[in-house]
Every structure is written in C-alpha cells, then in structure tokens.
C-alpha cells in the first residue's frame, strides 16, 4: 500500500507522516512552498491513499489575505483531486476544519472556513462525477505539546 501525505511538514500532517513511517507503511510526503504550484510537487506515480493536509492554515491570516488563501487552499485541493483521479488513487482523505461550521449554523465566518467548505463540496463532486472515493475530516481544537498559542483565533 502506497500512501501520499500532502503538507507532511505541517502541524497535523507531520504527526501522521511520522506515525505511518514508524508503523512501516510505504509513505511519501510533499510540502508546498509559498506560492509553489502543486503540480510541480506531485509525483508521477500511483498511490493507494492520499491524506491531504497541505493548506494555508490560519483563520486570521485568511481574513487579511482572502485571495491568497483561496489560491492556496481551494485551487491546491482542486488540482490534487484531479491528479488523484488521473492516478488511480483509491481514496483521498481531506483535512477540513471546524471553521466550516461557523457559529454552529453551518455558515463560515472567515475566508478560511469558506475555502474549506468549497473544498469539501469539491471532494463530494469528484466522488459523484468520477467515482473518486473521498472522506472529509473536520478537526476541532487539534492540540499537541508543540503547538503555538498565538493569534486572536486560538481556541485550545
């Protein structure tokens, strides 16, 4: 079984990547540098599973830079889904966010939340149109001992 982890150097992706390696899985990680096109990072080989964590992660940053965040989150996810469809990936596991839920009414309150919701919808669309198996996980208050506590949107 071959596994690809996007955003494998990020907060949650790095933990999963390390655990999969430790457990002996055939895993490869990619990380997108600022402004880099994901197509240049994606390997020209097939994988069974893709865990997609690559994103511009901060709500506060998205409020100040909505179009940049849109490109980094929505366009990257769209490109990855198309790549997965063309490389016979069995399942894409998409890392979404509690920011999609807004204040509990399902209406995002930030560009970051909106972009994650759009990406969830695109995952569903790829499942319906192309038969690509996708799963979206919404994380609430992810925390570890090495987490930073800064920012006005910190909740844990």
Where does each model-flagged region fall?
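N-terminal Rossmann-like NAD(P)+-binding domain of SDR-like oxidoreductases, especially those catalyzing
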Residues: 1-145
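ATP-dependent carboxylate-amine ligase catalytic core
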Residues: 149
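Short, intrinsically disordered, charge-balanced linker/junction segments flanking boundaries
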Residues: 25, 152-156
């Amino acid at each position: 079984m071959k596994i690809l982890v996007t955003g494998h150097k990020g907060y949650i992706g790095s933990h999963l990547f390390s655990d999969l390696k430790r457990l002996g899985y055939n895993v490869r990680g990619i990380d997108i540098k600022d402004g880099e096109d994901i197509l240049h990072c994606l390997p020209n080989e097939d994988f069974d599973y893709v865990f997609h964590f690559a994103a511009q992660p901060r709500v506060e940053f998205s409020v100040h830079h909505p179009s940049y965040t849109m490109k980094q989150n929505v366009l990257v996810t769209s490109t990855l889904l198309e790549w997965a469809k063309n490389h016979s990936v069995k399942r894409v596991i998409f890392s979404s966010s509690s920011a999609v839920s807004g204040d509990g009414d399902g209406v995002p309150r930030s560009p970051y939340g909106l972009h994650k919701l759009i990406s969830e919808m695109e995952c569903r669309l790829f499942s319906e149109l192309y038969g690509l198996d996708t799963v979206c996980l919404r994380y609430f208050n992810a925390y570890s001992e090495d987490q930073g506590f800064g920012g006005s949107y910190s909740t844990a």
